[in-house]
Amino acid sequence: MAANSKIFDFISLPENFNIHYLEWEMPISDESIHEYSSRISKKIKGKNIVLIGVSFGGIVVQEISKFIKTHKIIIISSIKTKNELPLMMQLGRKTKAYKLFNVKWIDDFESLALFVFGPIIKNRIELYRKYLSVRDKNYLNWSIDQLVNWNQKNPPKKIIHIHGLNDLVFPSVYIKKAIFLRGGTHAIILRKASWFNKNLPKSLENINFDNVRLKLGPDF
């Protein structure tokens, strides 16, 4: 939830895809994720829209799809319903314990990187620095609150879920009906880019490429 659109730097799609990147925006006071997504959706124009979101961005693009017509939704390292949240987050929602979570540690970049991508990147901290520019404390507190309290019960139609089997943020044991990548962590968009470059176009077959618009949302 702290990453920017540079997480898509290694993704290379055919020229007939018209790609637009959606950068994060600061939420308005007391704005829900539904209201936030409605505001973002007004910036999206075109036909045959495919929304792609990573992690918290995967939740946001699902909310955006409730306001605009989409051809397909692709989420990566994310969740489709509240039931796919890990047990600790589900307990946090019930007890409100997450409100005690202090995000002051974001000033320590290493702690932030380990939280977002998992301990597997410990030896590559500096390589990930450019991807984690969203470090506003108010924003992170808001996103944690919206994530833990997301209440979606049923996934949208025409959704494709791609997930790493070794994801520690959203453990695969809680994930239903997804394409699982062996050895994949929460950072598969970076570490499995060759797989995405080969397989994403296959996921977008039967689209009129004259009108296609891909909206790539960062890990908001």
Residue spans for each PLM region:
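Conserved HGGG/HGGXW glycine-rich cap/lid loop of the alpha/beta-hydrolase fold
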Residues: 1-28
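Conserved acidic catalytic loop of the alpha/beta-hydrolase fold
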Residues: 18-20, 34-49
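Short glycine-rich catalytic loops that host catalytic nucleophiles or stabilize transition states
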Residues: 22-24, 174, 179-184, 190-192
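Catalytic histidine-centered segment of alpha/beta-hydrolase-like enzymes
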Residues: 30-31, 184-199, 214-219
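Gly/Ala-rich beta-loop-alpha elbow adjacent to hydrolase catalytic centers
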Residues: 52-61
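Flexible "cap/lid" loop of the alpha/beta hydrolase fold
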Residues: 69-102, 213
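Conserved alpha/beta-hydrolase catalytic His-Asp/Glu region
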Residues: 105-151
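Short beta-strand/loop motif that positions the catalytic acidic residue
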Residues: 161-163, 167
